[in-house]
Amino acid sequence: MMTLALVGEKIDRNRFTGEKVENSTFFNCDFSGADLSGTEFIGCQFYDRESQKGCNFSRANLKDAIFKSCDLSMADFRNINALGIEIRHCRAQGSDFRGASFMNMITTRTWFCSAYITNTNLSYANFSKVVLEKCELWENRWMGTQVLGATFSGSDLSGGEFSSFDWRAANVTHCDLTNSELGDLDIRGVDLQGVKLDSYQASLLLERLGIAVMG
């Protein structure tokens, strides 16, 4: 277990592999290409409020990595290997996940995804074209999150806050949306095949179409 305060450092590839790091600050640090598989970060700050910059994790191996109660705002997570990653109770506003892989390819046509991103602020984060199928993605804040071409099919998105969220941009078929604040969801323009809603949400969405729900 270690506690550190690093500024502007390029992180060596194996420096933190499998380690547990608590209550540390990493300002403007470069984790690009680092092996962070199985590494656990608890209560760490990766966002420098003065410069308003996050850390660079691009192309890093984050397989089974854990971030709990961390500030990952504005982090660059492009093209990471993120199979089995856990991001819980974090701030990740404006972070960039384009090209991130949460999947295990078994053959060219069969794969599964694994990720646990929960109780996290994902406002204005970029998940364009990211595949997060059948993953645990509950109780997150998705305000203005960029999801063009993303697929969340079969994932648990329950308890989420989806204000200023473009439902038409992403695949949310077979998702659990119960107990979520659904923002501007218009059921006429979104494929909701297999989606789970609670009765309150269903009546709200029907009322938007001018249908009176009785009882």
Curated annotation (Swiss-Prot):
Keyword Repeat: yes
Annotated Pfam families: Pentapeptide, Pentapeptide_4
Keyword tags: Antibiotic resistance, Plasmid, Repeat
Any Gene Ontology biological process: response to antibiotic
Classification via Gene3D superfamilies: E3 ubiquitin-protein ligase SopA
Similarity section: Belongs to the pentapeptide repeat protein family.
Protein's name in the database: Pentapeptide repeat protein QnrB4
Source lineage: Bacteria, Pseudomonadati, Pseudomonadota, Gammaproteobacteria, Enterobacterales
Gene: qnrB4
